[in-house]
């Protein structure tokens, strides 16, 4: 068993279907899950640090810390439901979110990461919520899919749409059809010489 197979076996859930699809490389599928787990851990840790800022009477940092801890728990619930074995419905919730498109998860993570940074801008909220934001960005990139091959992009660029002529590539091709060349011999007939 190779190292990659061991890592994928550790990160895969029992009876997991492969919701992301075969077009994604294994390191992107499991790397995003690992990044989400690490992000959730640090979000909870630094959210607790922000909650302790109540000592300095900073209520906005207290609220930001609570939101950041909740976001960390939600990300941990969705990425590693094995951490919440004491709750019965965790696998149902995680499977329901796994069945949704990847852009749903990306939007959820990005949306959850922004309020703590706005409420209490500091290293703790920036790092904890920033990792969750980064996880959302990775899922968003996975939702976009991989880039088409060069042949497909060339074919799409050369297609005509709605009777339009393909782009001309010679030096005499102008932006406006039937444009007359500039004449420097005199003023244009409609010019008022003003």
Swiss-Prot record:
Signal peptide: none annotated. GO terms for biological process: bulk synaptic vesicle endocytosis; cell competition in a multicellular organism; clathrin-dependent synaptic vesicle endocytosis; photoreceptor cell differentiation; positive regulation of neuron apoptotic process; positive regulation of presynaptic cytosolic calcium concentration; synaptic vesicle endocytosis. Channel activity is inhibited by La(3+), which reduces Ca(2+) influx and thus inhibits it's function in promoting activity-dependent bulk endocytosis (ADBE) in response to high stimuli. The record marks 79 as: Calcium ion selectivity. Transmembrane protein which mediates synaptic endocytosis, fitness-based cell culling, neuronal culling, morphogen gradient scaling, and calcium transport. Regulates synaptic endocytosis and hence couples exo- with endocytosis. Controls two major modes of synaptic vesicle (SV) endocytosis in the synaptic boutons of neuromuscular junctions (NMJs); Ca(2+) channel-independent Clathrin-mediated endocytosis (CME) in response to mild stimulation, and Ca(2+) channel-dependent activity-dependent bulk endocytosis (ADBE) in response to strong stimulation. GO terms for cellular component: cell projection; endosome; presynaptic membrane; synaptic vesicle membrane. Pfam families: Cg6151-P. It comes from the Eukaryota. This is Calcium channel flower. The gene is flower. It is found in: Cytoplasmic vesicle, Secretory vesicle, Synaptic vesicle membrane; Presynaptic cell membrane; Endosome. It is a multi-pass membrane protein. GO terms for molecular function: calcium channel activity; identical protein binding. InterPro entries: TVP18/Ca-channel_flower. It comes from Drosophila yakuba. Belongs to the calcium channel flower family. Keywords: Calcium, Calcium channel, Calcium transport, Cell membrane, Cell projection, Cytoplasmic vesicle, Endocytosis, Endosome, Ion channel, Ion transport, Membrane, Synapse, Transmembrane, Transmembrane helix, Transport. Its main location: membrane. Homomultimer. Associates with the dally/ magu complex. SMART domains: Cg6151-P. The chain crosses the membrane at residues 35-55, 66-88, 113-133.
């Amino acid at each position: 068993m190779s190292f990659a197979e061991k890592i994928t076996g550790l990160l895969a859930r029992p009876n997991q279907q492969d919701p992301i699809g075969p077009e994604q490389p294994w390191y992107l599928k499991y790397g995003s899950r690992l990044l989400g787990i690490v992000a959730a851990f640090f979000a909870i840790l630094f959210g607790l640090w922000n909650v302790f800022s109540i000592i300095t009477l900073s209520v906005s940092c207290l609220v930001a810390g609570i939101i950041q801890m909740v976001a960390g728990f939600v990300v941990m619930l969705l990425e590693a439901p094995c951490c919440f074995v004491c709750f019965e419905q965790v696998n149902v919730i995680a499977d329901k979110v796994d069945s949704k498109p990847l852009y749903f998860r990306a939007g959820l993570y990005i949306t959850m990461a922004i309020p703590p940074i706005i409420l209490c801008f500091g290293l703790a909220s920036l790092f904890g919520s920033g990792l969750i934001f980064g996880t959302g960005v990775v899922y968003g990139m996975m939702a976009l899919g991989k880039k088409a091959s060069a042949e497909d992009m060339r074919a799409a660029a050369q297609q005509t749409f709605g009777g339009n002529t393909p782009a001309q590539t010679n030096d005499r091709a102008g932006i406006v059809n039937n444009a007359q060349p500039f004449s420097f011999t005199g003023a244009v007939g409609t010019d008022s010489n003003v």
